Amino acid sequence: MGVLKTDEWLKVSLKNPLEICRKIKKLFQEDSEQRVYNYLARNGMYKYNARIQNDFAKLLENKVWDKVEGFFKRYKKLWDGPNIPIFIFPHGSAGFFHSNKGNKSGLAFKDKMFLFYTPGLSDRELEAVFVHEYHHVCRLNFLKKEINDYTLLDSIILEGLAEHAVLKNVGVSFLAEWTRFYSSDAALKLGTKYIKPHLQLRKNDDLHDQLLYGLGRFPKMIGYSCGFHAVTKRKKNKYISEIATLTKPSEYFLEDYFKD
């Protein structure tokens, strides 16, 4: 499948994202395009305003759809990844996680992927978002675990491994800002307090996302940061191939991180 022609959809329905979501609601086993749109908008999809028309034109001018198709072909071969549909839309500024993920973001599932971009991103910045999200897609498929069985442990390691894929394939300059929020010592100290007691928390528990993203009273992006530093420490102590980052269980990457 690869990159779908959402640019053609946007040429017709840019002002009406609900019409776009009507096309994809079956992929979410959902009968309401409004609920699909609300979910996507919380995670980065645009809300139409005067700026979006210009943003879309610049994304077209930058040939973003063609570039992402090139990334897909490369990494699908490199990681023996699944052939999934990829949806590209302009990024909005009012997403729930906007302050944590800046002017670009994505969503990954076993069977589909969404990328939300603003104009002005370099090719390497475009690639970094793609690599992070497609690494998720590949790992979700290789692990063969039902999404409702995922725990906070699985989630933090998923994020840490994906950002290490960015480090390896795109470069240190293109790591997400959250990788620099805490030093390794600070992340370990905070993780021991907030993350360690809840590693087996299921994904559908409200506390899961609060800890993963560092919402409310919790340190900002502490789950993400802990996962990144745990993988960093594991890689320092033991060689891990890139394919192993897709197939090894989460527990493997947390060995010796939280020491009693």
Model region roles, listed by residue range:
Residues 141-150, 171-177, 237-242:
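Inter-helical turn/loop segments and adjacent helix faces that build the functional surface
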Residues 196-260:
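Pan-zinc metallopeptidase signature
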Residues 128-141, 163:
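Active-site recognition of the HExxH zinc-binding catalytic motif
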Residues 150-189, 259-260:
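Post-HExxH zinc-binding segment in Zn-dependent metallohydrolases
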Residues 114-129:
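Short pre-active-site segment immediately N-terminal to the catalytic Zn-binding motif
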